[in-house]
C-alpha cells in the first residue's frame, strides 16, 4: 500500500472517530490499524459497554454497486453463498441507533 493510500485511510479513521464521538460513542483508533498490536480492526467503539472492532475501507469508486442498492433505503442486507448476511447502512443512521446525540 502506498503512502497516499495509508494517509487516506488514516484520515478516514480519524473522521470516523470524530463522528462517533459527536454521537456520544466512545471510540478510538487502533494503533497501526491493529497490525502490530494483534488487534483486529481500525477502530474500537464502546457500544452498550462492549468493544466493537470496526474495520474501515475507503475506495474511490469501489463501492458504487452497494451505494446504488442502498439508495433510498435505510439499510441493505447482502449475503454471499455459505456466508453470514451483512447489513450496510449510512454511518449517521447507525450512530443514531446506537449513540446519544450531544446537545
Please identify what each model-predicted range represents.
Residues 1-103:
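Catalytic phosphate/metal-binding cores of nucleic-acid and nucleotide-processing enzymes, i.e., regions
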Amino acid at each position: 500500500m502506498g503512502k497516499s493510500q495509508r494517509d487516506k485511510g488514516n484520515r478516514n479513521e480519524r473522521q470516523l472517530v470524530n463522528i462517533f464521538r459527536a454521537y456520544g460513542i466512545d471510540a478510538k483508533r487502533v494503533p497501526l490499524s491493529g497490525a502490530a498490536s494483534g488487534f483486529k480492526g481500525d477502530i474500537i467503539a464502546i457500544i452498550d459497554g462492549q468493544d466493537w472492532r470496526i474495520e474501515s475501507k475507503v475506495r474511490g469508486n469501489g463501492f458504487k454497486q452497494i451505494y446504488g442498492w442502498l439508495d433510498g433505503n435505510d439499510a441493505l442486507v447482502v449475503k454471499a453463498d455459505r456466508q453470514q448476511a451483512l447489513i450496510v447502512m449510512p454511518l449517521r443512521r447507525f450512530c443514531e441507533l446506537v449513540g446519544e446525540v450531544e446537545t
